Amino acid sequence: VCDHDYTAPKYHFDRGVYDKRIYNGWGSPEPETALRFGPNIKDWPQQPELTDDLLVKIVSYITDPVTTTDELIPSGETSSFRSNPLRLAEFTLSRKDPAYVGRAKAVKALDEARTAGTLPEEVQAVYAALEKAGYKPNAAATNIGSAIFANKPGDGSAREQAASCQRVLGGAANFAKEYATKRYRSNCINWGMLPFLSLIHI
């Protein structure tokens, strides 16, 4: 039972509120006007091309039977950074291996030093061991990148960021006994990471 009389209030739509805030370029382009991005929309960082050889350091070793894309890059609180690749990458493996990001960045710094013409002592030691084994490494043609080992990574949603976040942090490869889905393996390839298969534990 309603004890109030209902009267429809008069409503007037004032589109001026929207006209002042939204640019409508239909029929009146302004090519000289610069596009302004929001504070959390960033360009993708430049990625190095694959070289003839690759020096890889495994920075995360995951022994779970399956590793999901949600473990590789969590959803939820990270969604607000989906247009900020570097900021989003800070959450990579945060629930599975919180130290991963720091270790991956350290390896990326080695490659940046190599590109700048400096070989850190850690890399020199590896090259010396390779030369002793009969190899002749060429620093100019050898990327240095990080990698993860997981038994079966990539299960779950087709989350492209599960691969792109690794790449942004300097990821160059993954090692796995098998890949949970073709789409995750394909995403790794599309982002320039080599999806190696390992028949034994590394």
Language-model-detected regions and their locations in the chain:
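Fe-S-dependent hydro-lyases/dehydratases of central metabolism
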Residues: V1-I200
